[in-house]
Amino acid sequence: MNVKMRAPHNEAYAYVNRTILSLTILTLLTGCGTFGSNSNQRTPGVIIDDTVLENLVENEIRKSDPGYKGSHLVIVSYNGLVLLAGQVASEELRQKANTVTQGLRRVRKVHNELTVGGPTSIMARTNDAWLTSKVKSRLIANKEVKGTRIKVQTENGTVFLLGLVSRAQADKAVEVASNVYGLQKIVKVFEYTD
């Protein structure tokens, strides 16, 4: 006798997944109206485009030369402005990464902060993650800075600040970030609204 048992937990998971998907879509659609009403913020579509662009840039750079195999590349895009950070083996690879990135369709501007040298250690990357979280939390906590509009990336002790902000907001963000112990330098990669 062939008896099929139904797994009730599978139906429950399917229901939960559908509910989560529905809520996510609803949140995104609601957010479209919120983001679209202020030209100083990125829309959800631009945020997705930036994420896709980051992956595309890294893939194209790595495909362009086998010398990138041991490189540590950090690619960050904010509104089509692309930050290249990390370490590569030679100045030639540093310049090539810049050229490859500039040749991509949705890239508006490239900030090449790649350094020539070996990749950073796990300990250095852990410290970078800690610095990023400290800077980001201070920016969000500061009432004078619109911290949610500023993206923070740290590489080898250098904090990069990206965003769509006024010059006053940029200066305040640098002031707030400079009070975090352990960072070596701050680089502004902002697009200014004024």
Annotate the PLM regions.
Residues 2-194:
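N-terminal targeting leaders
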